[in-house]
């Protein structure tokens, strides 16, 4: 594997050892109804049941435990990160486990339930504008003021390696899997999974799932160069508004087989379908992968790619904001 990547599979193996006693082995569930709709065998990796309600605890915990093992004589004074919510919760939880103060820079538009959860885990919240530039500038300032260490939500190698442990579990839980479908924002989970899958089972496909309104990963693959979103995207999938970055892009460029995009209505329909048929309260970000498999475009994937695992990335839903559910009921399915 290319030595220019920020992580190798060995890093994922180390992460697995580092975090396995502190996280859940999340289940893989199936749905005969969704199998019937898609004509494929679908498997759902339920990271909504993970500690803090999303996969993000894997990377955050691996990063913080790595910092401590690297400097056992003195813990970091603080850890600092920017997050739309899930990484912030995960970092807060992991920092509290290790007795380290955490500061999370959150856009004011982040779901209220995620902001409250960050505070409940003991972190201090600092608000930013929605743009990447605003979040990163404030994160740097807070890190300087607190003498803290920044833990990037998707470009930090230890975070990427931690997210890759999802694929180690899936390959054991679904031995005959033909493909994984993974939501992508900054690309930490996608990159970690791609490194792991291509190291252990190169024939297994890795597909990225992305909102059409935040399609920087698709555009980057199409153009063959890193192409960030030109402006803050508007999508219900709030967990994947970030663009892929310098560390995740080379892995995605080389190891991800294809990128599929879906509309906002497709995301809403898929999310509600999982709620109603599988009784799983996923957040819309997790619904993006389901929407992809339900989409017309996905029918171009060869029929022999039969056994597909969709990573349900999280379940931190702001129930007070679901005004779109009634509106969606009034529409025909896309």
From Swiss-Prot:
Keyword line: Allosteric enzyme, ATP-binding, Calcium, Isomerase, Lyase, Magnesium, Manganese, Metal-binding, Nucleotide-binding, Pyridoxal phosphate, S-nitrosylation
Recorded catalytic activity of this chain's protein: L-serine = D-serine; L-serine = pyruvate + NH4(+); D-serine = pyruvate + NH4(+)
Annotated residues for binding of Mn(2+): 210, 214, 216
GO biological process, one term: D-serine biosynthetic process
Binding locations of Ca(2+) 3: 210, 214, 216
Function recorded in the entry: Catalyzes the synthesis of D-serine from L-serine. D-serine is a key coagonist with glutamate at NMDA receptors. Has dehydratase activity towards both L-serine and D-serine.
Keyword Isomerase included in the entry's annotation: yes
Residues annotated as binding Mg(2+) 1: 13
Subunit structure: Homodimer.
Post-translational modifications: S-nitrosylated, leading to decrease the enzyme activity.
Residues where N6-(pyridoxal phosphate)lysine is found: 56
Cofactor: Mg(2+); Mn(2+); Ca(2+); pyridoxal 5'-phosphate
Superkingdom of this protein's organism: Eukaryota
Gene name as annotated: SRR
PANTHER family: SERINE / THREONINE RACEMASE FAMILY MEMBER (PTHR43050), SERINE RACEMASE (PTHR43050:SF1)
Family listed: Belongs to the serine/threonine dehydratase family.
Active site: 56 (proton acceptor), 84 (proton acceptor)
Residues involved in Mg(2+) 2 binding: 178
UniProt binding sites for Mg(2+) 3: 210, 214, 216
S-nitrosocysteine: residues carrying this PTM: 113
One GO CC term, this protein: cytoplasm
UniProt cross-references to Pfam families, sorted A to Z: PALP
Descriptive protein name: Serine racemase
Binding site for Ca(2+) 4: 247
Residues annotated as binding Mg(2+) 4: 247
EC assignment: 5.1.1.18, 4.3.1.18, 4.3.1.17
């Amino acid at each position: 594997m290319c030595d220019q990547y920020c992580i190798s599979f060995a890093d994922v193996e180390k992460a697995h050892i580092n975090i396995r006693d502190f996280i859940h082995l999340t289940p893989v569930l199936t749905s005969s109804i969704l199998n019937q709709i898609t004509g494929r065998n679908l498997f759902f990796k339920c990271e909504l049941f993970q500690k803090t309600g999303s996969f993000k605890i894997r990377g955050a915990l691996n990063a913080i435990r790595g910092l401590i093992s690297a400097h056992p004589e003195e813990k970091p004074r603080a850890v600092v990160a920017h997050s739309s919510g899930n990484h912030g919760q995960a970092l807060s939880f992991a920092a509290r486990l290790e007795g380290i103060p955490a500061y999370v820079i959150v856009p004011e538009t982040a779901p209220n339930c995620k902001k409250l959860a960050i505070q409940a885990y003991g972190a201090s919240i600092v608000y930013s504008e929605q743009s990447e530039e605003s979040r990163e500038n404030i994160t740097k300032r807070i890190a300087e003021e607190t003498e803290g260490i920044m833990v990037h939500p998707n470009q930090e190698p230890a975070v990427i390696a931690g997210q890759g442990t999802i694929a180690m579990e899936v390959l054991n839980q679904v031995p005959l899997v033909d493909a994984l479908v993974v939501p992508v924002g900054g690309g930490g989970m996608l990159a970690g999974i791609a490194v792991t899958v291509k190291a252990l089972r190169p024939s297994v496909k890795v597909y990225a799932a992305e909102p059409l309104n935040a399609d920087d990963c698709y555009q980057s693959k199409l153009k063959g160069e890193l192409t960030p979103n030109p402006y803050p995207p508007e999508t219900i999938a709030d967990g994947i508004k970030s663009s892929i970055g310098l560390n995740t892009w080379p892995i995605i460029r080389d190891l991800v087989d294809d990128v599929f995009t879906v509309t906002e209505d497709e995301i809403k329909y898929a999310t509600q379908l999982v709620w109603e048929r599988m009784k799983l309260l996923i957040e819309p970000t997790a619904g993006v992968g389901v929407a992809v498999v339900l989409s017309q475009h996905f029918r171009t994937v060869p029929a022999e790619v039969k056994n597909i695992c969709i990573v349900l990335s999280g379940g931190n839903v702001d129930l007070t904001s679901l005004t779109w559910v009634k509106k969606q009921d009034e529409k025909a399915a896309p």
